[in-house]
């Protein structure tokens, strides 16, 4: 069907679909979310609303650079709530690893597929052949991996799980229950398919209270016990904290807390 028809159906509980960056998808991306060149980055599609809430390229690539010196296990970069895939393609580009992005929104999934294609041309890396975007429910881990492995004709492992769930635009509290997909559901779904000490980055609201951060800590501990972790606050200056994330397993460093300044 037409690209506009593809965006209408909800995908919760339905088998995921591989998004093909074909002419229909390109036409849909150009008409619904004109591409914009990122400073020192690729040209990416996103609607104005997506750009308001998405991770900027400068932040996405700064995060990826922090991982460059870590010893990640073999495998792919997984983002089960990838949006327009800015963070995913930054990680794939800098780490030269294939990526698997899953997006529930039928409006965003085609954009993610085109952005993956655009970034592969821009970076000229060798990570693109087995990179895919799936339209579907990011909590359906087994079905997602099955669809992905069928698509690439091989099986592979997950090197890094990056999670940045959508949060309500008008939320004041930014509680864990407001995240979509829910963090506890995502981690419980993917845990059986990860290594015993997986590398994770959980992108969270900087408005989380200490008690809410403890909730996230407890959630991680309930699955992976005393796995190493580092809480990271990121600032772009102006005297405020812009980003909060939890780096787990091989993604963590020797400190339990750190402040990253984006220059």
Label the model's feature ranges.
Residues 98-103:
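Conserved SAM-binding motif I beta-strand of class I
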Residues 74-81:
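Conserved class I S-adenosyl-L-methionine
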Residues 1-7, 162-263:
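Class I S-adenosyl-L-methionine
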Residues 82, 106, 140, 167-168, ...:
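Short, glycine/acidic-enriched loop or turn micro-motifs at the edges of active sites
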Residues 75, 159, 198:
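Conserved acidic residues
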Residues 1-72, 107-154:
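S-adenosyl-L-methionine
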Residues 84-96:
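Conserved SAM-binding loop of SAM-dependent methyltransferases across substrates and taxa
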